[in-house]
Swiss-Prot record:
Main localization of the protein described in the UniProt heading: cytoplasm
Recorded superkingdom: Eukaryota
GO BP terms in the entry: oogenesis; translation
UniProt entry keywords in alphabetical sequence: Cytoplasm, Developmental protein, Differentiation, Oogenesis, Ribonucleoprotein, Ribosomal protein
Tagged with keyword Ribonucleoprotein: yes
Lineage: Eukaryota, Metazoa, Ecdysozoa, Arthropoda, Hexapoda
Location(s), subcellular: Cytoplasm
Chain's role: Essential for oogenesis; required for late follicle cell development.
Xref: SMART domains: Ribosomal_S3Ae
Protein's name according to its UniProt entry: Small ribosomal subunit protein eS1
Subunit structure: Component of the small ribosomal subunit. Mature ribosomes consist of a small (40S) and a large (60S) subunit. The 40S subunit contains about 33 different proteins and 1 molecule of RNA (18S). The 60S subunit contains about 49 different proteins and 3 molecules of RNA (28S, 5.8S and 5S).
InterPro entries: Ribosomal_eS1, Ribosomal_eS1_CS, Ribosomal_eS1_euk
Length: 268
């Protein structure tokens, strides 16, 4: 080893060696994520975002975030028929520390979907695009399987292609009628209760008995122009109020008209 002075050590090491460690969470704020009033659980969690600094507004970074929640958590229900459905909610607006979400899609869990696919039966699937009354364009995926006759000794329960076409046409008609005759809130209630799939299963019994009929997935393809009043109505904050409630220093609620200005005092 060469004998000599270490210039780096004699000058105190590298420049900027001692840096101040800043906790990244000190620059972030927590926001409550709110689900629409069509679900029993309104607060579904919290989300982090960097605090507003200059032109970087925190609400702009929150809008567009998608949250995936199980239907069992949204409805406070331990029924296993609800646990495998996942609803997607998208953040559309921010009020104070509340992130207001709207419906953005639905899906089944992977384990449930794979457990339904079995041998000796026919899989029937229909994909339908329909528009709700309030202007949401949705793509709905429906799935069903042929059921085995209990009195038959046959191992298989395959349907003929003519029967498959009839069942698929019946699925398409029912989904079109249910979606086009309801707004988004009514449609979400139907998806939560699984009423569309039950109607399809009941209607197709004469063609061929079915089982495990589900609305497998729902995608939102197109939305109407954003309206804050409709979003507040979904969250139970609308209703056309003409006055706002103001809390005084003593804690009492005082109703004052919109645009109220306090009188000018002569002396302070």
């Amino acid at each position: 080893m060469a004998v000599g002075k270490n210039k780096g050590l004699s000058k105190g090491g590298k420049k900027g060696g001692k840096k101040k460690v800043i906790d990244p969470f000190s620059r972030k704020d927590w926001y409550d994520v709110k689900a629409p009033n069509m679900f029993q659980t309104r607060q579904i969690g919290k989300t982090l975002v960097n605090r507003t600094q200059g032109q970087r507004i925190a609400s702009d970074y929150l809008k567009g975030r998608v949250f995936e929640v199980s239907l069992a958590d949204l409805q406070k229900d331990i029924d296993p028929e609800r646990s495998f459905r996942k609803f997607r909610l998208i953040a559309e607006d921010v009020q104070d520390r509340n992130v207001l979400c709207n419906f953005h899609g639905m899906d089944l869990t992977t384990d449930k979907y794979r457990s339904m696919v079995k041998k000796w039966q026919t899989l029937i699937e229909a994909i339908v695009e329909a528009k709700t009354v309030d202007g949401y364009l949705l793509r709905v995926f429906c799935i069903g399987f042929t059921a085995k006759d209990q009195q038959s000794q046959r191992k298989t329960c395959y349907a003929q292609q003519s029967q498959v076409r009839k069942i698929r046409a019946r699925m398409t008609d029912i989904i079109n009628n249910e979606v086009s005759g309801a707004d988004l809130k009514q449609l979400v209630n139907k998806l939560a209760l699984d009423s569309i799939a039950k109607d399809i299963e009941k209607s197709c019994q004469r063609i061929y008995p079915l089982h495990d009929v589900y609305i497998r997935k729902v995608k939102v393809l197109k939305k109407p122009r954003f309206d804050i009043s409709k979003l507040l109505e979904l969250h139970g904050d609308g209703g056309g109020k003409t006055s706002e409630a103001v809390v005084s220093a003593e804690g009492a609620v005082v109703d004052r008209p919109e645009g109220y200005e306090p009188p000018v005092q002569e002396a302070v």
